[in-house]
Amino acid sequence: MKRYLVPLLAACLLLTAGCAKAPDTAEPSADPAAAASAAPETTAAPRFAAGEETAYILCEGKSDGAKALSIWLRSSGMDAAESFVPDGLDAPMYTLPAAERALGEIPAATDETRHVRVAADTELLESGILAVWLPAFESATGYIAEIYAGDASVLAAEAAAGEADVLLMKKADASALGTMTHYGARYDLVSTIYSVI
């Protein structure tokens, strides 16, 4: 199982974005129009493709950290999801469920409950939404989210063992698992017609 940490991902993105461009050492061309026509036109391939709608749900475990993340994602996290437009798209990626937003009080983080283990579908991680959600959650609540990402089989193993506090997975995959003893509550989270390519 691969372990992905949002802070590591964010640091890699910052390092990549901060790299200086190598100086242009090519000799200047006498005819700028000839140089422009010789250079291939660069177009970035889209990172997302439209297709069938995929719904994601949150499966809440029994810890205070699970409850805290669940309430936060279903309240403040909805604002971030509603306006999330990743590079490669011109419109918000996710639509929200019709359900009302959570109004419960978020349990305070303690030394014993501060770490929240989150097992997430790889596509949620790759879309970039977790890099938006989790740092904001940590900042607002004092909890620390530890991310584990994988496909349906990895999430099924996490669910069976109860190793994660929260599962963020495709609704169809969760339905296939049936009753999960470690995760008593399930909530619709977001849906999208886009998939990461």
Language-model regions, residue ranges each:
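Bacterial N-terminal signal peptides
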Residues: 7-16
